Amino acid sequence: MSLLAIGINHHTASVDLREKVAFGPDKLANALQQLSQHEAVNGSVILSTCNRTEVYCDVKSGARSKVIDWLSQFHQIGLEELKPSLYVYEEQAAIRHLMRVSCGLDSLVLGEPQILGQVKQAYSDSREQQAVDASLEKLFQKTFSVAKRVRTETDIGGNAVSVAYAACTLAKHIFESLEKSTVLLVGAGETIELVAKHLHANGCSKMIVANRTRERALTLAEQFDAQVISLQDIPNHLAKADIVISSTASPLPIIGKGMVETALKQRRHQPMLLVDIAVPRDVEAQVGELNDAYLYTVDDLQSIIDNNIEQRKVEAIQAEAIVAEESAAFMSWLRSLQAVDSIREYRQSANDIREELLSKALLSLESGGDPEKVLRELSNRLTNKLIHAPTRALQLAAEQGEPAKLTVIRQSLGLDELK
């Protein structure tokens, strides 16, 4: 039993190579079935995302090159192209790597939580194909609990490191409850969609989407039960908004100082947060001069993000310590399992010797042998048989000039305790 992790990721391989080595839904089941039938593999889990492809295996001794060859052949990629970008981890290093990946410590965005869901899905897919053996089952279950511990004991995922999430976090800091806030989203592109998802996840249910094309706005609005308006209608709805988040490709500002000033009067000067994440700006810079209007630009958000990245790096130190501790503990547990097999075999061997000699002694007694003589002969033979293997091990260690091995054997036999 030996744990192996091989793979490529955004650190080691180009996008082109990552695409070639990816296991899409159409390939995954076949790949897992092939690995299950591989003579060198006891169990396997394949993790394949846009940033990494990794194969985790419980393998027989010396199977490293065989699994690499299989990966090369499966994707029909030459080893000369694959190997320079490939990393290989074995035993505790493989355990540690899986735990680091699952905790977001090896991600493009440090501490991102999505990778844990992807690891869980990879494990689930492998279980469906009956590719997960007992060792991998224990490893992945332990990994999930370690990831939970890291999230509980550190704040590695608690600081915004994307513009969309930073905008939402800023809104949460300024307004006590997003559940009571009305948000005007200007634009309907990918960034605004991410903002809407973050807002919705944080309890915001009152959203207005303003966009140049109504069709795109409707697609977004349907996901969150939001109202749709045109860009021209913004002046008529701006006063309703506690929060305005804007990201369009407009070459000119969409929201001007006068428009906001009018809206603030209608709001009786209740504060309004405006987050402009467009380049060039969607909101005139002069809006920031107005009382009760709090304007933040993409540069302000980047400053928050940079600070949060540094905070995540600090939290990552504690997370790495947890992973180091847990991976070492799991490796110790695995080694103890290997010892269990050896102990079982040793006990069985001793029992076989005992039964053999006892049978001979009983036959001697039945034949009228002297009981004392039979018992002495039994004890002598039993002693000689049981000490033969350790005696030979002591002799070999001495003959081969290996004092360290000799010391270990002496300690194992408890000889030093007899002095």
UniProtKB/Swiss-Prot annotation:
Disulfide bonds: none
Superkingdom classification of source: Bacteria
A UniProt-annotated Pfam family: Shikimate_DH
Keyword NADP on entry: yes
GO molecular function, one term: NADP binding
Annotated positions for site Important for activity: H97
Pathway recorded for this protein: Porphyrin-containing compound metabolism; protoporphyrin-IX biosynthesis; 5-aminolevulinate from L-glutamyl-tRNA(Glu): step 1/2
Keyword field contains Transit peptide: no
Reaction equation(s) it catalyzes: (S)-4-amino-5-oxopentanoate + tRNA(Glu) + NADP(+) = L-glutamyl-tRNA(Glu) + NADPH + H(+)
GO biological process: protoporphyrinogen IX biosynthetic process from glutamate
Keywords of this entry: NADP, Oxidoreductase, Porphyrin biosynthesis
InterPro entries per the UniProt record, alphabetical: 4pyrrol_synth_GluRdtase (IPR000343), 4pyrrol_synth_GluRdtase_dimer (IPR015896), 4pyrrol_synth_GluRdtase_N (IPR015895), GluRdtase_CS (IPR018214), GluRdtase_dimer_dom_sf (IPR036453), GluRdtase_N_sf (IPR036343), NAD(P)-bd_dom_sf (IPR036291), Shikm_DH/Glu-tRNA_Rdtase (IPR006151)
Positions bound to NADP(+): G187, A188, G189, E190, T191, I192
Positions annotated as active site in the UniProt record: C50
Subunit record text: Homodimer.
Miscellaneous comment as given in the Swiss-Prot or TrEMBL entry: During catalysis, the active site Cys acts as a nucleophile attacking the alpha-carbonyl group of tRNA-bound glutamate with the formation of a thioester intermediate between enzyme and glutamate, and the concomitant release of tRNA(Glu). The thioester intermediate is finally reduced by direct hydride transfer from NADPH, to form the product GSA.
Family membership noted in the UniProt record: Belongs to the glutamyl-tRNA reductase family.
Protein name: Glutamyl-tRNA reductase
Native source species: Vibrio vulnificus (strain YJ016)
Encoding gene per record: hemA
